Structures are given as C-alpha cells and as structure tokens.
C-alpha cells in the first residue's frame, strides 16, 4: 500500500494495482491533475471534502473511474456521475474492498443539523488496512493498521481525537483534516497523538508517497 496526502483530507491510495482518491476538497488543489484513478470516494458533502467547483473536472479527466459518495452528496453537489455509498455497505474493485462505516457527521453545534458521513475502511489481501473516518470520531472499526487521523475541526477537541485514536488502535497514523491549523497547532496535536497513543505517526504533508509494509 502506498499513500499520498494531497492536502487536508484528500488522500491517494495505491493498493493491489488500484488507485483510489478520497475526499477531493477545496482546501487543496494538489489533486486537481491526478489521473488514472480507478475509484473516487467522498465521505460527505462539505466542500472541504468534495470541491463543487473542481470535482467535475476530476471525474471527467478520469472517465474509467467509479465514483462512490455518501448518498446525500448526490443531492447537493452536481456530479457528472456517481453512486451512493451508504453506511454498512461495501464495494469490491478487483482485489480491493471498501467498507463504509458510521453514518453521521460529528456534531458541530446543537443548532446545526447533522448530515451524513461515511468512514472508509480500505483493505486488500496481504496489504495493510486503512481507515479514513471523514468527519466523525464515533466509529472505531477493528483490524485497522493505518489511521488517517483528523487533527482538528469545529466538531472535535483534542481529547476526543486522542481517545478515538486509542480506540482504533492502529499501528501507524498520519495527519489529515489539518487545513484549519497553524503549523504550531499541527505540531501540538501531532505530538500528542504520538505520545499519548500507541500509534507511530508519519507526517505526509510534503505530498510524497509513503509505502506501508504489509
């Protein structure tokens, strides 16, 4: 498995000869020119996870790619094509399995209605298992080797992030959802995750691919 962090919550996953892109949002442009994708995945409708201005171009430039999104995305974002991926469902692509977990975005404020959110568990035989939770810390699937760990959002506090990482109990982690943080904030939460959990953290914000051993 090879992982490339393309800014904020966008992650390119290369595993079992397949290329999957998760959450092409508007806090990053590094994914705009990505080609040869097999799957495009979106955890929820917020624009920092699916950029309504540029996602159509991404889909058009990857005509062979399947597009699977949390079902509410289909109602609020104009996509050239796409299918709904609801919680507790799964898709298979060659030797790669994508399991959707959770169902709801974390609470931002009691006055803001909750929307749908699916965490994504990506696995292939003989490869590490990756968990990208989107914007929720409510579900901690078992058997995760690598956690895409959200560092900060208006829906989370560090104490919750640490407890979430402990519950997932992955061997490796790397930061996502860092677009609202100053560099000092990134280092603070990154350091706490590393020191307060059993997870080995990897800073992938330079956009260079990281190969995870099986």
Where are these regions (language model features)?
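A short acidic, amphipathic alpha-helical/loop segment
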Residues: 53-61, 159-167, 189
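Structural motif
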Residues: 21-22, 41, 68, 132, ...
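Short internal beta-strands
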Residues: 63-72, 171-179
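Active-site metal-binding motif and surrounding structural segment of the metallo-beta-lactamase
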Residues: 27-69, 145-148
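Catalytic metal-binding/acid-base residues of hydrolase active sites
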Residues: 46, 72-73, 104, 137, ...
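Core dinuclear metal-dependent hydrolase active-site scaffold
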Residues: 1-35, 84-143, 155-160, 205-214
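Conserved alpha/beta-hydrolase "acid-adjacent" motif
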Residues: 49-52, 157, 183-184
